[in-house]
Amino acid sequence: MTRIKEFFTKLSESSTNQNISNIPKKKKKLFLALFATLLVVAAVIGIVAGVNSRKNSGDNGNEPHHAILKSSCSSTRYPDLCFSAIAAVPEASKKVTSQKDVIEMSLNITTTAVEHNYFGIQKLLKRTNLTKREKVALHDCLETIDETLDELHKAVEDLEEYPNKKSLSQHADDLKTLMSAAMTNQGTCLDGFSHDDANKHVRDALSDGQVHVEKMCSNALAMIKNMTDTDMMIMRTSNNRKLIEETSTVDGWPAWLSTGDRRLLQSSSVTPNVVVAADGSGNFKTVAASVAAAPQGGTKRYIIRIKAGVYRENVEVTKKHKNIMFIGDGRTRTIITGSRNVVDGSTTFKSATVAVVGEGFLARDITFQNTAGPSKHQAVALRVGADLSAFYNCDMLAYQDTLYVHSNRQFFVNCLIAGTVDFIFGNAAAVLQNCDIHARKPNSGQKNMVTAQGRADPNQNTGIVIQKSRIGATSDLKPVQGSFPTYLGRPWKEYSRTVIMQSSITDVIHPAGWHEWDGNFALNTLFYGEHQNAGAGAGTSGRVKWKGFRVITSATEAQAFTPGSFIAGSSWLGSTGFPFSLGL
């Protein structure tokens, strides 16, 4: 550094002694450009030298907090980011005494980054040359960022109580669910700008901030998994038995569904709080109006009966509307229908006829429909981001992207899902049990994909599980199914995870079973499993030979994908009142 200073001193003296006005114009420009460049280089070197000097004069790497931080970050996918983000916090050494402290600090730093992104998006919305879809996509980003902030705050609160208040396994599943959803939200924001080249300049303006938050969430998730896995292993070893809560079941229902909610889902006589009737005979004429009038943040079940009729509207159950239940008069009689789609300027996220985010949502005896048709591309009938949500005796009908299982824990039982391309997709931990899943006739040249699962990180506790169900074709596809190949799924994201087990698969499914997304993308990192399926399309001898595909022969391995294990079903499904099975 001293030599650089000496050089610039001599250079400055030389330029002062020489009459610059005598230098030819072209040489003068070259001289000034060179001088400016060297100044920048010197400044950069000075900054780096200063940082190194501070590092050398400060923490020598032998301090206890340094070892804890380094050890914690070693379990992450982005250890350098993990370490540098926390090490940059003033007086970090006084705050880090355990891995739990490292995780909490990481969550707080991530929250600050998310808030920064929020303000950046608000600034972008002020641009005057935005297209319709860009505006919609930016509002999607504001919504998902708002949800991310809630998830991070909940994670910090849950972490502060860890390992008390709840069982270890419940703590682990709740924390991993929150961080998995927070990660998913970042990708959802960027996905809204991927429909055409015209809106990618806006995506570029957002990308760095969203990807940074996604990586920070990934690091927190990895550390949470490492901490909870270690603690649970210690408990199992010390008790010499499995954790009690891991084997608990309630009549085959996940335990997060209370006995009361189980009755609500199965009972033929339920007293609603309000009634929706298109003919004016109820409290409201539209479903959206009934939701808007529902109490916010409710801890008690709020029941909305939707009488027979066709309701042409788009409905959003926001995060503020918790524990809402829709009860229809029958899946062929109560129909909520819309036609938003990507071709006409919507995003996939906003195209949903019904979108549900409020925790604890239940629905039974209703059809959710999007009538946009196969030529309109992505057009969602039902989007679900509500944690601990369940659907019973419902139909989801559309073409491309019918059912968007966006995030969090979800359960579908006795439902019909019909569509064409990627018609069950998203990154929730979703189990579909005893459902009818039917491919429809697509446009000429299209292939049908039953699933497109969006797991983007190996530590996310997400995936799509289809159990004890029936996979077939609708009446319009059956006569021509040879012209429209149908597959069980393709990998939307790098760590896509889908399991089909104990189900009946007809010959509508191509012998290869699964299809690529784009060349070799994700073929080594995905997890696609099949277990004890039957039917003309269930044979596995002709299946793909990808590293990520496997035929599951072990009942123990398959058990991990049942509702009791995969969506912590023993702690909540009992409350829905819907029929279900927790195990194999």
Swiss-Prot record:
- Please name the GO terms of the biological process aspect recorded for this protein, alphabetically: cell wall modification; pectin catabolic process
| Pathway the protein contributes to | Glycan metabolism; pectin degradation; 2-dehydro-3-deoxy-D-gluconate from pectin: step 1/5
A Gene Ontology molecular function term for this protein is: pectinesterase activity
Q: What domain of life does the UniProt record list for this protein's source? A: Eukaryota
Q: Where in the cell is it found?
A: Secreted, Cell wall
Q: Which residue numbers mark the site Transition state stabilizer?
A: Q400
Glycosylation sites per record:
N108, N129, N226
The protein's annotated catalytic reaction(s) are: [(1->4)-alpha-D-galacturonosyl methyl ester](n) + n H2O = [(1->4)-alpha-D-galacturonosyl](n) + n methanol + n H(+)
Disulfide bond residue pairs:
C415-C435
InterPro entries xrefs: Invertase/methylesterase_inhib, Pectin_lyas_fold, Pectin_lyase_fold/virulence, Pectinesterase_Asp_AS, Pectinesterase_cat, Pectinesterase_inhib_dom, Pectinesterase_Tyr_AS
EC numbers, comma separated:
3.1.1.11
Q: State the tissue distribution.
A: In the peel, expression is localized to the region of the flavedo close to the oil glands, and to the innermost layer of the albedo. In the lamella, expression is localized to the cell layers opposing the fruit tissue, and to the parenchyma surrounding the vascular tissue. In the fruit vesicles, expression is restricted to the peripheral cell layers and stalk cells. High levels of expression are detected in the core matrix.
Pfam families hit by this protein: Pectinesterase, PMEI
**Record-linked PROSITE patterns:** PECTINESTERASE_1, PECTINESTERASE_2
Q: Where does substrate bind?
A: T348, Q378, R490, W492
- Specify the propeptide location in this chain: 51-266
Top EC class for this record: hydrolase
- Give the active-site positions: D401, D422
Q: What else is known?
A: The PMEI region may act as an autoinhibitory domain and prevent untimely PME activity during transport.
PANTHER family named in the record = PECTINESTERASE
Q: Which family does it belong to?
A: In the N-terminal section; belongs to the PMEI family. In the C-terminal section; belongs to the pectinesterase family.
Annotated protein name in UniProt: Pectinesterase 3
